[in-house]
From Swiss-Prot:
Signal peptide, first to last residue: none
Keyword match Isomerase: no
Gene3D superfamilies from the UniProt entry: Ribosomal protein L17 (3.90.1030.10)
Name of the molecule in the record: Large ribosomal subunit protein bL17
GO BP terms: translation
GO molecular function, one term: structural constituent of ribosome
A single GO cellular-component term on record: cytosolic large ribosomal subunit
Organism encoding this protein: Cereibacter sphaeroides (strain ATCC 17025 / ATH 2.4.3) (Rhodobacter sphaeroides)
InterPro entries: Ribosomal_bL17 (IPR000456), Ribosomal_bL17_CS (IPR047859), Ribosomal_bL17_sf (IPR036373)
Stored PANTHER family: LARGE RIBOSOMAL SUBUNIT PROTEIN BL17M (PTHR14413:SF16), RIBOSOMAL PROTEIN L17 (PTHR14413)
UniProt cross-references to HAMAP family, sorted A to Z: Ribosomal_bL17
Amino acid sequence: MRHARGYRRLNRTHEHRKALFANMAGSLIEHEQIKTTLPKAKELRPIIEKLVTLAKRGDLHARRQAAAQLKEDRHVERLFAILGPRYAERAGGYVRVLKAGFRYGDMAPMAIIEFVDRDPNAKGAADKARVLAEEALED
């Protein structure tokens, strides 16, 4: 029986799941929209909701708790500097999961997970900055 099963195991160990969701949460915070499989997106949603709630609190303890879950300091900084103030008035429901068809090859159900009031310019901004820096070095 499936009683009291709290989360999807995704055929991974605890450490692998923890690393997977830390990386995915960082990518979502950086790009504000990512494409992944539907079960991973559904499991990522409560993790992101809790991180944004920590960012809304904004104190030192909340920052340390977020840093314990995320891998990179720049993601923690972006979470507290941009996303926390953006959702200060919203009481939950910071991300949405949209179904995006099936993956060619294994027919895995795909989904797009994104922030509700996302900045469309955030997606690919790091790549654009890198390309501009490389072009500046060439000149």
